[in-house]
A protein has these predicted regions:
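Sec-dependent signal peptide recognition
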Residues: 2-10
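Alpha-solenoid helical repeat scaffolds
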Residues: 4, 15, 20-440
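C-terminal interaction modules of eukaryotic adaptor/scaffold proteins
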Residues: 444-447, 453-460
């Protein structure tokens, strides 16, 4: 029920879209004239409508509905409901009377009654297309399958009604079936005249379907029609990032963010802007935009990983590590293996950087701890032991203590069981062990490893 009520705001727009009176009656001019007085002089409007309903029109259901719709268009739901009921009293099988009462119910946020009335209109007149559309709109955000079924039912009765394709696209979009939504919109656009809303929705569908180039084309066409469309300007920035057209993306970002006071910016807008800046190597400004994204929504702690990546590119490892710690600390559960591994590797890279040699022991200790966890969590994967070997090799640069030996041996025992093992990794393991035994003057054992290298890579 809660979801059903939440759809009301968007559905009121649908009343405008699908609630137009069918071809006007001979009395339409008089109805329109009287309708102009509804707000300023309701009594006089009522008199005019009463006059219209005299004589042969006393039981004219079409006219009753037309007057009711005039009241509804002015927001007068009580009067509109009264005329809808009068039409039903005259003819209980009047489909358009139920269509009107459904619109009144929707205006009053009574979506259950609205859907019931639309369904009754369809029952009374299976060709009442507006009732199909409105029923589909009511359930689109609550039970989209019901919407889909109703639209497909209408399509069998009115295959040439191009509006159905447009509505199908909306329903598929709601269901997350972006490929089908795209196909439906394409069908609509072949014969329809796209509006600003059409370009906006279609460009969004294409983006979600990862058709970034086509989305960008629709964005450009939409912006020609509506240069200030906020969503289209956003998509221009998003599409260009995905297309790796960073220059165009930054220009689109400048246009999109030209109104700093706009309340419709979301955290992801700043994330995309930051990634464009990062791609353009404007690292300081990229971090500033990532910070804005976090300030807007602190729950998205994954942004700290983006910040860490920027600092890593600048080789500012202390800040990269600090940001990565914030990323790990913001997780609701335990970090996965890949996150642990990347954190360990970040500490290893910091230890190898000449700018941070004073902190090398700290970075190596942290890296060793993390890679030990990786090795324990995935014992059949070589990476944990392999990177522990690299860490301990840095601790023992002359290989006099053989600190890396047990880890290279452990990694090698796993790698040798894998036919697709990377040659360079196998060579590194065997090289270390060959050199270790050479330092120990165990030349026969050393030679075994050098021969293994020649088997792996004869050109070495």
């Amino acid at each position: 029920m809660k979801k059903l009520v939440l759809t009301v705001m968007s559905l009121c727009l649908a009343v405008t879209m699908w609630g137009q009176t069918p071809a006007g009656s001979e009395w339409s001019p008089q109805v329109k004239q009287a309708a102009t007085m509804i707000k300023e002089n309701p009594a006089k409007a009522s008199e005019a409508f009463d006059e219209l309903m005299k004589g042969k029109n006393k039981k004219n259901t079409s006219l009753l509905v037309e007057i009711g719709r005039a009241y509804l268009d002015q927001g007068k739901t009580a009067e509109a409901a009264e005329y809808a009921q009068r039409a039903k009293d005259v003819n209980s099988k009047c489909a358009v009377a139920y269509l009107l009462s459904g619109d009144v119910a929707l205006k009053l946020n009574d979506v259950n009654k609205a859907s019931s009335d639309y369904n009754q209109a369809i029952y009374l007149d299976e060709n009442c297309s507006e009732a199909y559309f409105k029923y589909a709109q009511v359930y689109k955000g609550v039970d989209p399958q019901l919407s889909l079924d109703m639209l497909m039912r209408l399509q069998t009765k009115a295959p040439d009604d191009n509006r159905i394709s447009k509505e199908l696209a909306d329903v598929y979009y709601t269901m997350g079936q972006y490929g089908k939504a795209k196909e439906a919109y394409e069908s609509y656009l072949k014969v329809g005249t796209p509006t600003e809303q059409d370009y906006t929705r279609y460009a969004t569908l294409l983006y979600l379907n990862k058709d970034y180039a086509q989305s960008s084309d629709m964005v450009k066409k939409g912006l020609e029609l509506a240069p200030e469309n906020h969503v289209l300007k956003r998509l221009a920035m998003y599409d260009n990032l995905e297309l790796k057209d960073y220059k165009e993306g930054l220009e689109a970002a400048a246009t999109f963010f030209s109104n700093p006071g706009n309340p419709d910016y979301v955290y992801l807008d700043y994330v995309y802007f930051a990634r464009l800046l990062e791609a353009d190597k404007q690292y300081d400004e990229a971090v500033a935009q990532f910070d804005k994204a976090l300030a807007m929504d602190k729950s998205h702690t994954e942004i700290y990983k983006d910040i860490s990546d920027v600092y890593e590119k600048e080789r500012d490892f202390p800040k990269a590590i600090e940001a990565y710690k914030n990323y790990l600390g913001g997780m609701k559960g335990d970090p996965d293996i890949s996150d642990l591994f990347l954190y360990g590797r970040l500490n290893y890279y910091a230890a190898t950087d000449s700018a941070y040699q004073d902190k090398q022991p700290l970075y190596l200790a942290e890296a060793d701890t993390i890679f030990a966890q990786v090795a324990a969590k995935v014992p059949d994967n070589y990476l944990g032991n392999f990177w522990r070997a690299r860490v301990n090799s840095l601790r023992d640069p002359e290989t006099t203590q053989g600190l890396a030996k047990p880890y290279y041996e452990a990694a090698l025992s796993i790698l040798e069981q894998k036919p697709d093992a990377t040659k360079s990794v196998l060579v590194e393991c065997n090289s270390y062990l060959g050199y270790y035994y050479f330092v120990k003057e165990d030349y026969n054992q050393s030679k075994l490893y050098w021969n293994k290298i020649l088997e792996i890579d004869p050109g070495n």
